[in-house]
Curated annotation (Swiss-Prot):
Superkingdom of source: Archaea
Keywords, ordered alphabetically: Hydrolase, Protease
Organism: Methanocaldococcus jannaschii (strain ATCC 43067 / DSM 2661 / JAL-1 / JCM 10045 / NBRC 100440) (Methanococcus jannaschii)
Name of the protein this chain belongs to: Uncharacterized protease MJ0090
Coiled-coil regions listed in the entry: none
EC number(s) recorded for this UniProt protein: 3.4.-.-
Gene Ontology MF, one: peptidase activity
Class of enzymatic activity (EC top level): hydrolase
Gene Ontology BP term (one): biosynthetic process
Family: Belongs to the peptidase U32 family.
Entry's transmembrane regions: none
Alphabetical list of PROSITE patterns matching this protein: PEPTIDASE_U32
Length: 407
């Protein structure tokens, strides 16, 4: 039976957290500056996390704290300190992969979600984790039919356990992220969140024959780089099996968080009101505006032993849209909802702009009205200050970006 599903969005800082909540996330997941799987993201100070939790709770939303790296003996005191802080800060759950950390979190009364790093691929393993966790984040390597079986068997065994699954974002070439390539090549530990992603580089594949000769099989291709996951075309099926939809992207910017959250929120709501299929093409087009390596459905409809869809020919970002910084807000007049923007790039009526700031989050606007010296203009030039009528509240110092489609 289809039920309302939670939408869980990523945040690498306060700007992303506020953006996610403003655009419809039910919950946000984030990390402190230690012991989480995105060590290279901005991440939160303790003070920022407290502020973010307050913002979420004031809006009846939740915050989940990632503490899901490999935990070594010398990490144990730090783990205890982080869990104590999480408890006092009133986080809504901790995302954990280490069993000892789960037990400690249980003793503190913290709600636990078993991380995707736990590699839960069957109902027996899920049932085991239900002793420690209220939710498991299922392995990305499962098919939709396998997930259905897991859910049915848990229900049959009367196991009270929520299931969370990824619906959008980057995929790892290794099983649930357990990769040693970054560590081997650069001494940067992927399983402690410090991956340098050598899989995203171009590689040369050479075959050595028995006679000692070499043959270049493939050169300058993205052999190890999977396409990004995008399940926007399968929301109704996924709502049948998951309690929570997770958007990957704790290393991504606020505009990515804004658009993915907005579209998946609208998609979920449209399934419930019956308008999903009418809006599907719009959803797909909007998701092409964010950074992507071309889209795929991951393992949901593919056997793990069959061929996979990799990036191969695509040079980095497959999106046809680019974000260009064009100015900053120097004043905002609340009564008339007009932002005064100092430009270092031309701006014209009909352009789509993004305005991003720590308190503002990320907002998108289509420019419909501009004035210079109280006179309407169609185009504002680089170096000018222009008043732009907006639908959102923005703030002095916010950065302004032009969203431009490339040919």
């Amino acid at each position: 039976m289809m039920v309302m599903v939670e939408l869980l969005s990523p945040a690498n800082d306060l700007t992303c957290l506020k953006t996610a909540i403003d655009y419809g996330a039910d919950a946000v997941y984030c990390g402190l500056k230690e012991l989480n799987m995105r060590a290279n993201a901005k991440n939160f100070t303790r003070e920022e996390l407290i502020e973010g939790i307050k913002y979420a709770h004031d809006n009846n939303k939740k915050v989940y704290l990632c503490t899901n790296t490999v935990v070594y003996e010398n990490d144990l005191k730090k783990v205890e300190e982080i869990l104590d802080f999480a408890n006092s800060a009133e986080v809504d759950a901790v995302i954990v992969s280490d069993l000892g950390t789960m037990q400690l979190a249980n003793e503190l009364g913290l709600r636990v979600h078993a991380s995707v790093q736990c590699n839960v691929t069957n109902s027996l393993t899920a049932k085991f984790y239900s002793k420690f966790a209220k939710r498991v984040i299922l392995s990305r390597e499962l098919t939709l039919n396998q997930i259905k079986e897991i859910r049915e068997n848990l229900k049959k065994d009367k196991v009270d356990l929520e299931l969370e699954g990824f619906v959008h974002g980057a995929l790892c070439v290794a099983i649930s992220g357990r990769c040693f390539l970054s560590s081997y090549l650069f001494g940067r530990h992927a399983n402690c969140g410090d991956c340098l992603q050598p899989c995203r580089r171009k590689w040369k594949l050479i075959n050595e024959h028995h006679d000692g000769t070499y043959e270049i099989v493939c050169e300058g291709k993205y052999l190890l780089s999977p396409k990004d996951l995008c399940m926007i075309e399968h929301i109704p099926e996924l709502m049948e099996v998951f309690d929570s939809f997770k958007i990957e992207g704790r290393a991504k910017n606020a505009d990515y968080v804004m658009r993915t959250t907005k579209i998946y929120r609208e998609a979920i709501d449209s399934v419930l009101d019956g308008s999903y299929y009418d809006k599907l093409e719009y959803f797909k087009k909007e998701l092409q505006k964010v950074y992507n390596r071309s889209y795929d459905t991951g393992f949901y409809f593919r056997d793990i032993n069959k061929n996979h869809d990799f990036q191969y020919e695509i040079e980095g970002n497959a999106s046809k849209y680019r974000k260009i910084e064009i100015g900053r807000v120097v004043n905002f007049y609340k009564k008339v909802s007009v932002a005064e923007i100092e430009l270092w790039h031309d701006l014209k009526i009909g352009d789509t702009i993004l305005i991003i700031g720590k308190t503002t989050g990320c907002v998108e606007e289509v420019v419909k009205s501009m004035q210079i010296n109280h006179k309407d203009v169609e185009i504002a030039k680089k170096g000018e200050r222009v008043g732009v009528k907006l639908n959102h509240l923005v703030r002095e110092g916010d950065r302004v970006y032009l969203l431009k489609e490339t040919i």
